[in-house]
């Protein structure tokens, strides 16, 4: 249960990081 919650938070964090940082550094990696 704890691992699932942590995984969802991590996935959400990575998703926002891709949207924000990914667009700045390399937009091509956003699709990966």
UniProtKB/Swiss-Prot annotation:
Coiled coil: none
Family annotation (InterPro entries): Calcitonin/adrenomedullin, IAPP
GO CC annotation terms, alphabetical: extracellular region
Keyword ATP-binding (UniProt): no
Subcellular location: Secreted
The entry's keywords: Amyloid, Hormone, Secreted
Signal peptide coordinates: none
Entry superkingdom: Eukaryota
Pfam families xref list: Calc_CGRP_IAPP (PF00214)
GO biological-process terms attached to the record: amylin receptor signaling pathway
One of the record's GO molecular function terms: hormone activity
Family to which this protein belongs: Belongs to the calcitonin family.
Domain notes: The mature protein is largely unstructured in the absence of a cognate ligand.
Assembly information from the UniProt record: Can form homodimers. Interacts with IDE and INS. Interaction with INS inhibits homodimerization and fibril formation.
Job of this protein: Amylin/IAPP is a glucoregulatory peptide hormone that plays an important role in the regulation of energy homeostasis. Selectively inhibits insulin-stimulated glucose utilization and glycogen deposition in muscle, while not affecting adipocyte glucose metabolism. IAPP function is mediated by the CALCR-RAMPs (AMYRs) receptor complexes. Amylin can also bind CALCR receptor in the absence of RAMPs, although it is more selective for AMYRs.
Protein name: Islet amyloid polypeptide
